[in-house]
Structure formats: structure tokens, C-alpha cells
């Protein structure tokens, strides 16, 4: 970490070129001149600030910008990520941002700043859910929320550098109750899962370690399980129905939720793998489901049809075990 901190501080051009390359790899149209201006504006204004990790503070907005690039957001959002802490930290004004980067980016930066100032009340999860709805309602531009989620994700990735345990726990709890559900609501399921996992490590470290050890044990005894079964599924399912088949290992937090919901002991947990089949149409999805159920028997209480009844955020799929 120290080596990276020194390198980032001494070679800002090197990291700008990395960001520029990442944007091009993701085929995002952008104003390179404005991007470079924002990058160095952030670097210069945060020059005297240091994060808990010992890194230059400007490495944080840089990391947030890269998260947004990987999500393929527009260049205005990426520039906003580079500038998102400047007003809040008092190193720039609205007028400066507006004059240098335009009205749209200034409004986005101002929106993220306002969102950062809203504090989660000391309430239970039920009320935290209402708070999530409140945040969604006040975000006039959904990009403001996505930038804030990326900001929280990077802060969670570096949470272990915070020495004060009570502060660390508060951030993790807030992430689990508010920001992870928000990520799910706007369709970023991978981000939601990572936020949950990072928060769970802090809010219940003992439970996390126990479950993670179980996952490692099952992983050790199921070498190449995912790749073998992806190949198996490809051989079973007709290719003209399917666009993509992938597999993944479930995370500790989702396993923990299942244990609580179904009152299952840790030793009984065996299904730590999930497979996703993306089809060309809804009709193809049901055809593939029929093929799968012909090969393997369905567990009745584990079937969910989110095509006929989509989730509130528009999510549509079929889940089966």
C-alpha cells in the first residue's frame, strides 16, 4: 500500500493514462480534455489530504471513477466521481466547479454532496428500509445515487484501515441496511453482494469466518465444480435458446441469510454454487426451464418465477433448485 501511495503521489500522469485506457476499453464516449482537467483539479485540490490507509486522498475519487467506468456510466458521471469530494471537503466551491466543468457536472457534484450530508437515523432495519426509499425519492438524477454507491463501495473496500472500531462498525451497519439494498433496487446486484459481504465481515466477524471456512471446505472438495457444470449445462441445453451460461460461488452473507430464514445449521449448507443461463427471449427461458427440469428434479419450495411477477425494480428471471 505504501509503495502504491508513493507512486500515485509522484506519478499522477501514469494513473491518468490508466483511467483513460480503461474508458477506451469500455467504449465510453468522452471529452478527454475535460477529463484530464478534472483529474488534475482533484489531484491538486486534495494534495494535502491523506486517507486512513496512508494513500493520497485523490486516490479515492480516482478509484470511484474507475468503478463507474467499469459500470459503463457516461463521462459526466466519471468526471463527477473525480470531483465528488471537493465541495464537501471545502477545497472547491460550486461556482468553481460550474465555471470549470459546466452546469450538468456541477449539479451532479452538488447532488452527491447533499446526499453525503444526509445521516442515517439510529433506527432498526425496518426504518432503514424506509430511509432507502427516501434517498431514492430525493435523487432527481439516478446518476447521483450510482456515484454515491460507487463512493461507498470503495470506502468499504478500504474499511480495514480505519482504526476506531465503533466508527468502522457504524459504517458497515449503514452499508448493510441502506446502501446494499439501494444497489439492489437500482439493478446493481454484483455491487449489492460485494457491499453486503464487506459489511458482514465487520458487523458479525465470527459468523462470517465460520461460514467462510465452510465455503473453503466445500470449494476444496469440489474442484472445477463450476467449469464442469457450465460445460454440462451447455451440452444439455440447446444452443439456439441460450446467449450465455455462467456459474459462481455464493457469498457468505447470502448463506447466512438462508441459515437464519430456514433455521439451517451451518453443517447442512451444501449449495454454495449458482448458475445463470441467459436466453434470447422469455419464451426461450421457459423452454430451457423445461429441459433443466427433465434432467433434474425440481425442489418445489425453491422455485420462483420473476418473469410472470417481476420485482419492483423490473428484474425478471426464473429461479429454480
Locate each region found by the language model:
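Short, solvent-exposed alpha-helical surface patches in well-structured domains
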Residues: 34-37, 108, 170, 287
Amino acid at each position: 500500500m505504501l509503495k502504491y501511495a508513493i507512486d500515485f503521489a509522484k506519478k499522477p500522469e501514469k494513473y491518468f493514462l490508466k483511467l483513460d485506457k480503461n474508458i477506451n476499453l469500455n467504449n465510453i464516449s468522452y471529452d478527454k480534455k475535460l477529463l484530464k482537467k478534472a483529474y488534475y483539479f482533484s489531484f491538486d485540490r486534495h494534495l494535502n489530504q491523506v486517507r486512513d490507509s496512508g494513500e493520497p486522498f485523490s486516490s479515492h475519487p480516482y478509484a470511484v471513477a474507475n468503478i463507474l467506468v467499469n459500470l459503463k456510466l457516461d463521462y459526466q458521471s466519471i468526471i463527477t466521481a473525480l470531483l465528488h469530494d471537493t465541495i464537501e471537503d471545502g477545497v472547491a466551491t460550486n461556482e468553481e466547479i460550474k465555471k470549470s466543468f459546466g452546469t450538468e457536472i456541477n449539479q451532479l457534484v452538488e447532488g452527491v454532496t447533499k446526499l453525503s450530508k444526509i445521516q442515517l437515523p439510529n433506527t432498526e432495519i425496518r426504518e432503514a428500509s424506509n430511509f432507502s426509499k427516501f434517498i431514492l425519492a430525493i435523487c432527481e438524477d439516478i446518476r447521483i445515487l450510482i456515484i454515491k454507491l460507487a463512493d461507498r463501495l470503495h470506502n468499504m473496500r478500504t474499511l480495514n484501515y480505519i482504526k476506531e472500531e465503533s466508527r468502522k462498525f457504524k459504517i458497515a451497519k449503514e452499508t448493510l441496511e441502506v446502501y446494499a439494498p439501494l444497489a439492489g433496487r437500482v439493478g446493481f446486484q454484483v455491487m449489492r453482494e460485494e457491499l453486503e459481504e464487506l459489511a458482514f465481515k465487520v458487523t458479525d466477524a465470527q459468523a462470517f469466518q465460520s461460514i467462510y471456512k465452510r465455503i473453503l471446505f466445500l470449494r476444496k472438495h469440489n474442484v472445477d465444480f463450476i467449469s464442469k457444470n457450465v460445460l454440462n449445462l451447455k451440452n444439455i441445453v440447446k444452443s439456439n435458446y441460450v446467449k450465455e451460461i455462467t456459474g459462481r460461488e455464493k457469498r457468505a452473507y447470502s448463506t447466512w441469510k438462508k441459515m437464519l430464514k430456514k433455521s439451517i445449521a451451518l453443517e447442512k449448507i451444501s449449495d454454495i454454487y449458482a448458475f445463470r443461463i441467459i436466453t434470447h427471449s422469455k419464451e426461450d427461458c421457459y423452454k430451457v426451464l423445461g429441459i433443466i427440469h427433465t434432467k433434474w428434479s425440481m425442489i418445489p419450495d425453491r422455485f420462483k418465477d420473476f418473469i410472470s411477477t417481476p420485482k419492483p425494480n423490473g428484474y425478471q428471471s426464473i429461479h429454480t433448485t
